[in-house]
Amino acid sequence: MLRIADKTFDSHLFTGTGKFASSQLMVEAIRASGSQLVTLAMKRVDLRQHNDAILAPLIEAGVTLLPNTSGAKTAEEAIFAAQLAREALGTHWLKLEIHPDARWLLPDPIETLKAAEALVKQGFVVLPYCGADPVLCKRLEEVGCAAVMPLGAPIGSNQGLETKAMLEIIIQQSTVPVVVDAGIGVPSHAAQALEMGADAVLVNTAIAVADDPVMMATAFRLAVEAGVLARQAVPGNRSTYANATSPLTGFLEALA
């Protein structure tokens, strides 16, 4: 069970809605993933249409919507998008994204912290997408963010946990949930993040661009479940030296 702010989730896998070939395929993949929290870019939704091709099937699926401010380049733009999302969707939950460079889509730490502080004061449940910077994550936690979402690698890159060393520090020091976001390319990346102690992962591109998104979503669901179980089982310590699983001492003594 995962708790963030006022909500609890059985699944530790969050999903996105971009890059799917159709809204039907998107919903089928989300259902196969078991995800209960789904991100939604406000720039992709036509709020004037109650039957929007993306929004309507998500509402019907009964998932918790997490609108995001993707496309915002400044704190001011992100705050405006957040207010629009709250008014249109009736939710105070928000994934805060501010990335001024469209080529790399790396989050702006200064603008993100500025916006997060303002949005928390306005009553939002803020989940900020941020770099894997332990100091920044602690500052975001201190201004009241409900969770932190450090990247594993650039958005959509499928590179995996390139920031593993920093993620380990963030996980160790955080008192709010840590959701590894961006760069996760295959189910084993997700399992590794959960084994490390992350509370959840957010996956979009890896599922949406697979030849079979529904099958890939199922694979991610199973990988996340395995990662959670592995962490709960408490793995043995790593050792520099070999440690025989079947010592032969007694057997050899019997032959003497």
Swiss-Prot record:
Ubl conjugation among the record's keywords? no
Role? Catalyzes the rearrangement of 1-deoxy-D-xylulose 5-phosphate (DXP) to produce the thiazole phosphate moiety of thiamine. Sulfur is provided by the thiocarboxylate moiety of the carrier protein ThiS. In vitro, sulfur can be provided by H(2)S.
Q: Name one Pfam family in it.
A: ThiG
Q: What is its EC number?
A: 2.8.1.10
Pathway-wise, it operates in:
Cofactor biosynthesis; thiamine diphosphate biosynthesis
Q: What is the lineage of its organism?
A: Bacteria, Pseudomonadati, Pseudomonadota, Gammaproteobacteria, Enterobacterales
Provide this UniProt record's keywords sorted from A to Z.
Answer: Cytoplasm, Schiff base, Thiamine biosynthesis, Transferase
Q: Which residues form the active site?
A: K95 (schiff-base intermediate with dxp)
GO BP terms: thiamine biosynthetic process; thiamine diphosphate biosynthetic process
Task: Spell out the protein name for this chain.
Answer: Thiazole synthase
